[in-house]
């Protein structure tokens, strides 16, 4: 692996983050053959925020106008991709305030809220309400884990005011939640 001067590394670091704002400090450290701490110091020197803040910024700029059914700041987790009426993806980092103190396991309502708000966000109408939800918690989620929720909209049925959204939440490649959300939707008059 080529060793870069500090100046060259910082220039290439800036380009790498511009090309992929979702790249982690660990991935950058591996890419440039330096420690994670060196990458963090480079980011601070270049005034580049940490991954979490970059994701929030990209999501708020990119998806704030796309999501019609609820304000973007009411979505639980951060939307990283959305195609209205088709699919959406969000991430949620489980922190100490989301877990039971005695066993560090995430409270189920946080997983449900991420899945439900993603199912709501993918609906292209101003009014989107959950009429029914069937949720199965597959395994517990622990503090420090990142949940990636993926929503897929089923093709329309006879009742055009009801849409079914399937949501699967993952930690890594492991499914932690499966949900089927029946969504009523309408345009505000």
Swiss-Prot record:
Biological processes, Gene Ontology terms: fatty acid biosynthetic process; negative regulation of DNA-templated transcription; negative regulation of fatty acid biosynthetic process
CDD domains with a match to the protein in the record: hot_dog
GO molecular function, one term: DNA binding
SUPFAM superfamilies per the UniProt record, alphabetical: Thioesterase/thiol ester dehydrase-isomerase (SSF54637)
Keywords: DNA-binding, Fatty acid biosynthesis, Fatty acid metabolism, Lipid biosynthesis, Lipid metabolism, Repressor, Transcription, Transcription regulation
Keyword Cell inner membrane attributed: no
InterPro entries in the cross-refs: HotDog_dom_sf (IPR029069), Transcription_factor_FapR (IPR017275), WH-like_DNA-bd_sf (IPR036388)
Keyword flag Repressor: yes
Assigned protein family: Belongs to the FapR family.
Function field: Transcriptional factor involved in regulation of membrane lipid biosynthesis by repressing genes involved in fatty acid and phospholipid metabolism.
Protein name: Transcription factor FapR
């Amino acid at each position: 692996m080529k060793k870069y001067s500090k100046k060259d590394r910082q220039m290439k670091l800036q380009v790498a983050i511009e090309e992929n704002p979702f790249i982690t400090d660990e991935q950058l450290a591996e890419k440039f053959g330096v420690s994670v701490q060196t990458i963090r110091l480079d980011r601070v020197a270049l005034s580049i925020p940490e991954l979490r803040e970059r994701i929030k910024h990209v999501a708020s700029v990119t998806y704030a106008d796309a999501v019609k059914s609820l304000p973007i700041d009411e979505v639980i987790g951060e939307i990283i991709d959305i195609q209205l009426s088709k699919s959406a993806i969000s991430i949620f980092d489980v922190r100490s305030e989301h877990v039971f103190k005695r066993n560090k396991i995430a409270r189920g309502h946080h997983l449900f809220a991420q899945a439900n708000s993603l199912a709501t966000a993918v609906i292209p109408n101003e009014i989107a309400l959950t009429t029914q939800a069937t949720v199965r918690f597959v395994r517990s989620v622990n503090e420090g884990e990142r949940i990636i929720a993926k929503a897929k909209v089923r093709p329309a049925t006879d009742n055009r005011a009801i849409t079914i959204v399937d949501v699967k939440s993952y930690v890594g490649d492991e499914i932690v939640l499966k949900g089927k959300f029946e969504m009523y939707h309408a345009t505000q008059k």
